[in-house]
Amino acid sequence: MTYLRLIAIGSAVAFLIGTISLHFLQPGYDPVNQLMSELALGPYGIIMLFAFIALASSISTLAFVIWRLCGNITLHVVLLIGAACFAGAGILPIDVFNGAHIILVFCAFVMCGLGMYLLPGCLNSSSKAHDRMISWGLGGMLVFTVIVGQVSLPGGIAQRLEAAILLMWVVVFAWRTTR
């Protein structure tokens, strides 16, 4: 299962590298107010497709690890739906498929948030309370950031925080569940 840990974590890192590099490559991009999906609009936009696929790979690999550990089919399916939605959002760019893209990103975050809620219940570890605190804490932070992003935080900042929270969750539990 060590190779699965490396795939999940490596895919999360690939997402970070892709999106961070696009911040520097795309001319005129405003990370404070523009959504991350808008990184796909410039001349190097294809990198964003690979970033979305890397994010989907990270989440689906974690789903597979969790399913192998505890056999929880509900959590497995929820995370796979989230991963598929992220992949779909990469395939359907925001400039051409605006409505579908936004719905896919929304559904992906909802499914991953639900996964954050469900995960501690299926882990049979001696540190179940610790797993719950981490998973539910990050899930709560995700929900809070979404709400604040709708009310007072600029959209670009809110979305980056949401992505960072999701990536932290994936990396922490890819590491914790495969040791």
Label each residue range with its predicted role:
Residues 2, 64-75, 121-133, 179:
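Membrane-interface helix-boundary motifs at transmembrane edges
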Residues 74-90, 136-144:
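Small-polar-interrupted transmembrane alpha-helices in polytopic inner-membrane proteins
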Residues 27-34, 91-103, 151-164:
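Interfacial helix-loop-helix junctions of multi-pass membrane proteins
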